[in-house]
UniProtKB/Swiss-Prot annotation:
One of its GO terms (molecular function) is protein folding chaperone. This is Trigger factor. Residues 424-482 are annotated as: Disordered. Belongs to the FKBP-type PPIase family. Tig subfamily. Residues 448-482 have a biased composition (Acidic residues). InterPro entries: PPIase_dom_sf, PPIase_FKBP_dom, Trig_fac, Trigger_fac_C, Trigger_fac_C_sf, Trigger_fac_ribosome-bd_bac, Trigger_fac_ribosome-bd_sf, Trigger_fact/SurA_dom_sf. It comes from the Bacteria. One of its GO terms (cellular component) is cytoplasm. Pfam families: FKBP_C, Trigger_C, Trigger_N. It catalyses: [protein]-peptidylproline (omega=180) = [protein]-peptidylproline (omega=0). Residues 162-243 form the PPIase FKBP-type domain. It is found in: Cytoplasm. The keyword Transferase does not apply.
Length: 482
């Protein structure tokens, strides 16, 4: 087999392939053997019919079409392997010569990774915000912890923000009841904004037993996007009483003996979260600088495929109704033209980023180890609430392991870039990036940073949930409503 590569553009090539007929003869032999097992000819046992009779029965051209159809994908792969091209996406194949006894000739046009001239990574200078912790931020953490140990007490006054109320809801659209919007005894934290728009404003000022109507746009269900008249009735009002922030509370809520020790711990907790946020800013700034300094030719078909995927996902939930989609965008203060423009911009940036990261990974000779993949798998399994082995099976079934591998490699690459750059905060202080990205730009610290962020997020969620559970059943229901 002979193959040549013709460069059509920086991101697209045409591969010309010639396959001698003699190389296809084994394919014909296999095809006829399979056909002989399926076709019964008088006077011959199954699988024993002569090839000429089989050709006469099904036609030589039909057999040629079958053999060529089965042979082309493998020959294309062989041609790609023997060349230096790195395909992106599926090829467009055209068979230009197909005759029995003659060479098979076909072309394959495909998008490829372009050649990219990379900037001097050692000259990269990254500047990010310094870590600053305010008393208000620590107080917010303390308030959250106090709420965890708070109690709900009934009050005889109008509802206000922060109260927990039990409410009945009903709604009508065009004068007709909406059954799915009717509920009784629903617990809700006033001011949380967790239910429907306008509800909190309607509840504030209502006393037990009072009702109020308000107009809102339904966000889900059969009447999603339609204006509805909602009636809310307050059944009960409770306020959360918080424990005093003193030494006794510190001993109750933590392993510390004094409130000052507890505040120091909360300060460190805030600092830990901000360190992770700073690391994310470093990563994002590094990528931003690289994109600004590097020209990356974009393969249009790959960009368009990403655009098509985004559009499909956006309107799939609307049964691909373009009119409803346009109405939804209008309600958000946007338009289809703005959506399309933003989608293209984001798609181009995403493709450019992937191509740039892959080129950098090649230049830096980034290797993905088994430990890197295992760390990512464990991290993802925590995020999805699955066992690592279960998630691995899902990724294998959906052929998503290559995508995970590529993502891990890109993470290792940006870590290596950051490690080699000069990183300072806006006050001019050097930032030790090894804490986040490892001494050699590895993924271990990156994964640990992500773990810290997840742990802090989980702790916040647990705090809210435990607060509701410890305080009152109604608060539990309010959490569910959120």
């Amino acid at each position: 087999m002979k193959s040549t590569v013709e460069k059509l553009s920086p991101t697209r090539v045409r591969i010309n392939v010639e396959v001698p007929f003699t190389e296809l003869e084994p394919d014909f032999d296999r095809a006829f053997k399979e056909l002989a097992k399926q076709v019964r000819l008088p006077g011959f046992r199954p699988g024993k019919a002569p090839r000429k009779l089989l050709e006469a029965r099904v036609g030589r051209e039909a057999m040629l079409d079958q053999v060529v159809g089965e042979a082309v994908p493998g020959r294309y792969t062989e041609a790609v392997t023997s060349s230096d091209v790195q395909p992106l996406g599926q090829p467009e194949i055209e068979i230009t010569k197909k005759e029995y006894g003659e060479d098979l000739v076909f072309t394959a046009e495909v998008d490829v990774r372009p050649e990219i001239t990379l900037p001097d990574l050692s000259a990269l200078e990254i500047t990010v915000d310094p870590i600053e912790i305010t008393d208000e931020e620590v107080d917010t953490e303390l308030q959250s912890l106090r709420a965890r140990f708070g109690t709900l007490t009934g009050v005889d006054r109008p509802a206000k923000d922060g109260d927990f109320v039990s409410i009945d809801l009903s709604a009508t659209v065009d004068g007709k009841d909406v059954p799915e919007a009717t509920t009784e005894g629903l617990s809700h934290e006033v001011g949380s904004g967790q239910l429907i728009e306008g509800l909190d404003d309607a509840i504030v000022g209502l006393s037990e037993g009072e009702s109020k109507e308000f107009t809102t746009t339904l966000a889900a269900g059969e009447h999603a996007g339609k204006e509805a008249v909602v009636t809310v009735t307050v059944k009960s009002i409770k306020e959360r009483e918080l424990p005093e922030p003193d030494d006794e509370f510190a001993q109750l809520a933590s392993e510390f003996d004094t409130i000052d020790e507890l505040k120091e711990s909360l300060t460190e907790q805030v600092r830990r979260v901000k360190r992770v946020q700073q690391a994310e800013q470093i990563r994002d700034k590094a990528l931003e600088l690289l994109l600004e300094q590097t020209e990356v030719p974009l393969p249009e078909k790959i960009v368009q495929a990403q655009i098509d995927d985004t559009v499909h996902n956006a309107i799939h939930g609307l049964d691909h109704d373009e009119d409803r989609f346009a109405e939804q965008l209008a309600e958000q203060g946007s338009s289809r033209e703005e959506f399309d423009a933003n989608t293209r911009t984001e798609a181009e940036k995403a493709v450019k980023t992937q191509l740039l990261m892959d080129a950098l990974a090649d230049q830096l000779e980034v290797q993905v180890g088994q430990g890197d993949l295992t760390e990512r798998l464990v991290l993802m399994s925590r995020q999805y609430g699955l066992e690592p082995q279960q998630l691995l099976q899902i990724l294998q079934q959906n052929n998503q392991l290559p995508a995970m591998f590529a993502d891990v490699r890109r993470g290792l690459t940006i870590a290596a870039v950051v490690h080699g750059a000069t990183v300072k905060d806006t006050d001019g202080n050097d930032i030790d990036t090894t804490e986040f990205f490892g001494p050699s730009g590895g993924a271990q610290a990156e994964a640990e940073g992500a773990d810290e962020a997840d742990a802090d997020s989980d702790a916040d969620s647990d705090t809210e949930a435990d607060s509701d559970a410890d305080s009152d059943t109604e608060a539990d229901e309010a959490d569910e409503a959120k």
